[in-house]
Amino acid sequence: ALMLAGVLTLGCFPTTVGAVNNAYDGTKPADGTTKKQPFLAGTGGSTNFRIPGLVTLNDGTLVASSDARWNGGGDGGGLDTIVSRSTDNGKTWSYTFANYLGDNGNVHNNGSTAFIDPALTTDGGTVYMAADLYPAGTALNSASYAPKTGHTGYDSQHRLVLAKATDSVTAASDTAQRMNAAFTYYLEKNPDENATSYYLLKDASGNTVSGYTVDAYFNITGNGVNTNLFCGDSPYFPYPTDFIYVTKSTDGGETWSEPTLLDVKKASEQSLLVGPGRGIVISTGEHKGRIVFTCYEFTNGDKN
């Protein structure tokens, strides 16, 4: 079950595998190592890092996370999530880009997606990470457009809703235009676990839109398309707000699972953002095993 009362509370996650990301304007940096510090300037090609998180596992492994802000410093315009792990008490670190889309070209880009504010928690073995994902060109600052109130981004069955790009409004349009598009399409998990498409793209009548494949990371291919649903060139696009994006690692931060999107933001909220740093996993009592992250709401300059 999920609950929101100043915190995000998560249930269990299915066992999943690591992501395979498409290359758009940038190429995902190769995994690498650093000494003494997890995020030295230049790590993975990024000059700037912000919003650190750190947890220690039962076996002593350290797992750290941060925004990779590339050559920028603001809260939007092409941020990605870097995670680094150490098994020798911080002497050496091995990093990977856990959340990465590549539409920023690995530099600050006002029109790109942004992963921001990663937070970590652990039960001692599994590491859980929550982050905010903004669609193309959208963020509270340092992006082309501000996020909008008026919609949660999901339907009543907690399915991600989408609008079809047209000649008048696209996934890269001003968010004032995007918010008024017809969000009559949605994603439904494919009941066939052996199918190529993890999600089915459906219209308002429940008919599957033919010719497209959507994987577990929201990459969409087919009909001449090879992009991600959150990128500016997608043929279908989400509501222009932020989305809470949760993954887990069962191997000490080396690889990360397919994401789960949490439908907890109110339509009246401009953004609901993960309180960065770390969460907790309740270890005793009735709610043993419950995963908890703090969060805050930001609407028109008010932070609650």
Would you name each region that the model predicts?
Residues 9-25:
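Sec-dependent signal peptide cleavage junction
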Residues 4-8:
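Hydrophobic helical h-region of N-terminal Sec-dependent signal peptides
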Residues 22-304:
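Asp-box/BNR beta-propeller blade signature and adjacent active/binding-site loops
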